[in-house]
Amino acid sequence: MAESLPVSSCRLLIIEDEYVIAETLAEALREAGANIVGVIRWLDEATRFASNHAGEFNCAVVDINLHGALSYPLIDMLSSQGVHVVLLTGFGVEALEAAYRELPRCEKPFNQDRLIGMLCSKFGA
């Protein structure tokens, strides 16, 4: 088990359409001390969850492309709720819409330690 990192205040929603990536990420983040509130693979399901559970999570790792649907409206919703968003994407920064280029992101294939480091910078002691 990985050493506990200062992400214990992170109540995290993972929104990723690739099952293996989502589950691997969830396990690594749990080991780092994050509280995973959900792992969701579909944009419409994630949008409903965000609407119905606002305030129950404070961070989301969001894949930009979920089964061919771009997640920008969901990212806007999460941001308006005060949720810290980290993008997980196979796109380079130049492929992102301009409004989203400054958000923290990990490009696929991603490095788990880098992603955990991003969360630590948001929720660290």
Tell what function each PLM region has:
Residues 16:
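Conserved acidic carboxylate
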Residues 39-59:
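Acidic, metal-coordinating helix/loop segments flanking the phosphotransfer/catalytic sites
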